[in-house]
């Protein structure tokens, strides 16, 4: 069940990538194989409804082909970060807060991606 929380940020940030067209075509083929729907990823990520449809399709794809889906999303995320499309400038500072007065459990709300990361800090 915890792996589900790991992949939510991957799904969300993979939507925002506009990396190389081979990644987009691989993603398109993967979604087409698993859901039977043919999406144009570059057009789909421009609307909020399209992003929701893409996330749902990726969830279905992960249920049937978890290794292939995770690998593709990690590659896309890496390329997006290397190209500077996902950067620290996009993340608003000051969003880190503690929960339940436990300094070892931090959450960071990232408004840019509209999601929360839960981080366990070990000293």
From Swiss-Prot:
InterPro entries: Lipoprotein_3 (IPR001595). A lipid is attached at residue 20 (S-diacylglycerol cysteine). The keyword Signal applies. Its main location: membrane. It is a lipid-anchor. It is found in: Cell membrane. It comes from the Bacteria. A lipid is attached at residue 20 (N-palmitoyl cysteine). The keyword Nucleotide-binding does not apply. Residues 1-19 form the signal peptide. GO terms for cellular component: plasma membrane. Pfam families: Lipoprotein_3 (PF00938). Keywords: Cell membrane, Lipoprotein, Membrane, Palmitate, Signal. Belongs to the MG439/MG440 family. This is Uncharacterized lipoprotein MPN_054.
